[in-house]
Amino acid sequence: MPHNFKPGDLVFAKMKGYPHWPARIDDVKDGAVKPPPNKCPIFFYGTHETAFLAPKDLFPYDKYKDKYGKPNKRKGFNEGLWEIQNNPQASYSLPPASVSSSDSDVPEEKSTARSDEEEKQEASQPILPTASVSASDEEGSEKEGLKRKERITTAPSAKRTKHSSSEQEPDSASSSKEENSDSDQDFTPEKNTPRIQRRITNVGEKNKVLAESESDSKSESEDEKKELKKSPSSSSASSPSLSSSDSETPVKKTPRGRRPAEKPAPKPRGRGRKAEPIPSSDSSDSDSSVDRISEWKKRDEERKRELEERRKKEQEEQLRRLREEEREEDEKKKREKAEKGDKSDSDSDSSKSEVTAPPKPRKSSSSSDSEEDKKQVKEVKPVASEIKKGKKDKVRAISDDSDSDKKVKKTIKKPRPAESARKTNQKEKRGERPRGRPSKVEKEKKKPEMINSRRVVKKEPTVEERLQKLHSEIKFALKVDNPDIKKCLDALEELGGLQVTSQILQKNTDVVATLKKIRRYKANQRVMDKAAEVYSRIKARILGPKSESQQKIAEKVNTAEKGPEDENQTGKAGEDMDASMNGDFLSQRTETAGDKEQELEGLNLDNKAEMETKQNNHAEHNNNPTEETFEPRPISSENQNS
């Protein structure tokens, strides 16, 4: 259950970020800010700050004295423990040094109202022992007098150095007043100096003005310190006990943002107003310095304008001169070009007339023309060099005026020699080009040579590539619809001349197969013969001469004995080859049914004649075993035919 607290109860108040702090519950005075519901106004000992806290954050002092009443390093905590025991009626109405320092920032009108309020609060508070009350009254009156003196002295001076705060001793209340007043017044030069700096543009003038103002402010601040040191000595002697206690509290005081003390609201306004009065001496110095600077600036600007006008005039004159010179050069070039054009026309006419003549005299004429051109170029060069010299002399005469003009002239000077050199080179090239051009006849001669050289550059096809190419040509030449016999014969002739190896033939077995088929091509006898010849050539190259002779003997015997069979087979093979040649699966349309019957009759007659001759010559061929072995075959075929 939360404890019911009353005004005047001593407690330990817990605030976030702080230890349990010795405090007292205050009574809400008339006209004061009312606390929110369920919260009590709290006065913190040691720091003399106030806040509103809920009862749950408050703990009775007597009950929790042993728990929370231990000394702590926090500033103001130990002082608070001492105050809650020895001076529980302490209040922010008895002003410590911090209050006087805050009041010193406020203008005179508000400070007098504040002092009246403090007197009323002291009258309303419970009475302290007589000695302490009398001492506090005396001290309050003395402090009010000191405040008025300070305002009178500090009115003319707006700047204070920070050395005064470090030189003062922190034991007396007067020293704390001076520290606070100095610290507040240190902000004034920071506000005033930017205004002066905005006016001053030159760096040298700025430094001088600032040095003078600082020296004036230092001398004034030292005088004020002496007066202030004399005045608080009497007040410190009259009340030693209270001044010592008051001087200790501001030293150990911590600024607590979460415990807002009752501070005067118009502090920033007071500082803003205080910054307004600027010392008359400084203002007069600054005004005079600004006037001087403005005069100096005006003079400087006038000089700059004059210099710029001069430069502009000089530059314009230079540009005019250069333009005139360029125009003259352009006119000279045009004249030279016109002369050269006339010469080139005459030369071209002469060259056209001399096309039929040998080229040797042409070379001599071109060499003479080139010599003339070189002479002309040499004559042009000294003219250009003289122009350059004239330009340099003019530029030197102008460059004596000012250093800044030299830079401009250098930029104008530099591109000129390079441009002139380029122009002369271009002239030489233009002069040489028409002389060195070849005639149309020479060009026509060179064209076929170039084409031949390009052809030579191409790689020669290998044997395998040529073989494949010829194979494809043969196939296309022997089409069923439109056979090209001549092309086929040429391709076969070329194929027979190729140095084919066994490896190439193993890779390209299709070539051998087509040759075998073409040997049985009935449409044209020449193609058959040529194919057989090429086939035998390739076979002889691969197998050798012995195998060739043996094959010839075997072929003769086979043709003698297997005549009818071979003819039938060749007929069938020819038909198959013609049907399947080049992927054409159409049968030959030339052969008719009647032709086939006639061929069969002719074959039967041939077979009968051969059989008769064989029976008559049987006795002669008994010694040859090859003939004996092949005798029964024709008999069997004859029986089949019958």
From Swiss-Prot:
Residues 294-342, 595-624 form a coiled coil. Residues 107-117, 205-230, 289-352, 372-381, 416-449, 553-565, 607-621 have a biased composition (Basic and acidic residues). Residues 90-104, 231-248 have a biased composition (Low complexity). Residues 87-452, 542-642 are annotated as: Disordered. The keyword Nucleus applies. It is found in: Nucleus; Cytoplasm. Keywords: Coiled coil, Cytoplasm, DNA damage, DNA recombination, DNA repair, Myogenesis, Nucleus. One of its GO terms (cellular component) is cytoplasm. The keyword Plastid does not apply. One of its GO terms (biological process) is muscle organ development. Residues 7-64 form the PWWP domain. One of its GO terms (molecular function) is histone H3K9me2/3 reader activity. Pfam families: LEDGF, PWWP. Signal peptide: none annotated. Belongs to the HDGF family. PANTHER family: HEPATOMA-DERIVED GROWTH FACTOR-RELATED, HEPATOMA-DERIVED GROWTH FACTOR-RELATED PROTEIN 2. May act as a regulator of myogenesis. Promotes the repair of DNA double-strand breaks (DSBs) through the homologous recombination pathway by facilitating the recruitment of the DNA endonuclease RBBP8 to the DSBs. This is Hepatoma-derived growth factor-related protein 2. It comes from Xenopus laevis.
